[in-house]
Amino acid sequence: MVGEAANGQDAIRVANENCPDVAVLDYGMPLLNGIGAAREIMRVCPRAKVILLTMHTDDHYVLEALRTGIKGFVVKSQAPADLMRAIHEVLGGMVYLSPRVSRTLVQAYLTKSALPADPLTPREREVLQLVAESKTTKEVAKLLGISAKTVESHRTRIMKKLDTPNTAGLVRSAIRLGLTQV
C-alpha cells in the first residue's frame, strides 16, 4: 500500500505522487466521488488500474464505472475476500465485477433495459456533487480552480438539464445519480 486518502482530491494527489499499480476508491468519497477521482487518476497515471468499492449495485452505477475505464467493481457487503480477488484479477489484466453486480448486469441485459445517457459533463457532475455537499459557490470555485461565475454557469446548465428549479432539486438529483449520500 502506497497511500491513503480522505477524499477524492487527496486520492488524486496520492496517485500523482506514487502512481500505484492499483487504486481502490470508495464511490462515496467527499469532494470528488470515486468515479471523478478515477477519471483523473487514470489521466495522471495511465498504468494505474482502478477498483471501485461501493454499496451501489444498480446497473447505471456499474455501467458508468465501466464507461469510465474502471477495471473492478466490488460491493462493500462482499468486500474482504472479494476485494483481494478483484486486485488479483485486475493486476492480471482482467475486469472484475462482484457476483452480485454481475447478476444485476445480466438481469438488465436480459430485460433489455434502456439506460439513459448521462446528460451531465464530468465537470458538471463535480459541481453538482459539491453543491449537494453544501459547498457555496465560492467554495466550489476554489476547490475546482475556476471562477464563481463559471460555477454559476455550470449550475444553471445543470438545473436546465435536470429540469429542476432550485438547490433542493439539485440535491435530490445528486442523490439519485449517486454523487452524494443522505
Residue ranges and their predicted role:
Residues 13, 35-47:
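Short amphipathic alpha-helix used as the core "switch/output" element in two-component signaling
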